């Protein structure tokens, strides 16, 4: 893999060289204001910055209570760095914030957070799990990241195939010439897909690409 669109399109990276080619950050004043509005809710408020996911120690145990498989919860814990002290101090220590993540248990907490985000024109939210909210700058999403990378490489998005199953994949499927939803995709992603392949557990990406690669090889 040479390039990666990360953090819901907020970062485009050259993997081999370890270079960040593009980063769209959230203003720290907005991050702090949003945190202060939601801090009394039983949620996490994770900061994505400096290639690290920072989670407040007092909120880390909420992951245990999420309606997720044990394997998914183990993964979520493994990619987080717990910090002590105040959120304000931690925010001041880190570099650019490219994304925020909120885990919640109750629908009313989700709704309360989303209403606040919707009130800020420069923010957007999406999700990849049934219990999370992913927040980026309004211009940062996977579709925008794909289009930027295509422009950087001199490739037309019309010649790209994109696969996805979450709501956060929807803009990417719309941007690509062939947007392919996994069979296990959420309804919003299935709705915008050009095609549907087998589920993630059934190796849907490989099944879809195999005949395409075979046809390319035969044409040479």
Short names for language-model regions:
Residues 1-2, 21-24, 62-66, 143-144, ...:
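Short, hinge-like loop/turn segments at secondary-structure boundaries
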Residues 37, 41-44, 48-163, 167:
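Conserved acidic, metal-coordinating active-site core of Asp-based
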Residues 1-31:
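Alpha-helical substrate-recognition element adjacent to the catalytic core
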Residues 118, 133-220:
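Mg2+-dependent phosphoryl-transfer enzymes with acidic/Ser/Thr/Gly-rich catalytic loops
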Residues 1-7, 125-126, 179-183, 197-198:
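Short hydrophobic/aromatic-enriched beta-strand-loop microsegments
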């Amino acid at each position: 893999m040479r390039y990666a669109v990360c953090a819901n399109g907020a970062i485009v990276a050259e993997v081999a060289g370890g270079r960040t080619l593009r980063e769209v950050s959230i203003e720290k004043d907005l991050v702090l204001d949003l945190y202060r509005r939601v801090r009394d809710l039983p949620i996490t408020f994770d900061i994505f910055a400096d290639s690290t996911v920072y989670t407040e120690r007092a909120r880390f145990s909420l992951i245990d209570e999420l309606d997720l498989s044990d394997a998914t919860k183990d993964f979520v814990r493994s990619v987080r760095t717990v910090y002590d002290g105040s959120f304000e101090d931690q925010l001041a220590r880190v570099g650019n914030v490219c994304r925020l993540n909120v885990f919640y248990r109750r629908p009313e907490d989700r709704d309360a957070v989303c209403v606040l985000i919707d009130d800020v024109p420069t923010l957007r939210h999406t999700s990849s799990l049934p219990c999370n909210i992913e927040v980026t700058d309004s211009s940062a999403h996977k579709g925008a990241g794909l289009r930027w990378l295509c422009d950087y490489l001199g490739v037309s998005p019309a010649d790209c195939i994109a696969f996805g199953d979450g709501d956060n994949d929807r803009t990417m499927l719309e941007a690509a010439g062939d947007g392919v939803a996994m069979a296990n995709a959420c309804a919003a992603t299935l709705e915008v897909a050009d095609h549907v392949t087998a589920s993630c557990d059934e190796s849907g990406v490989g099944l879809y690409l195999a005949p395409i690669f075979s046809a390319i090889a035969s044409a040479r």
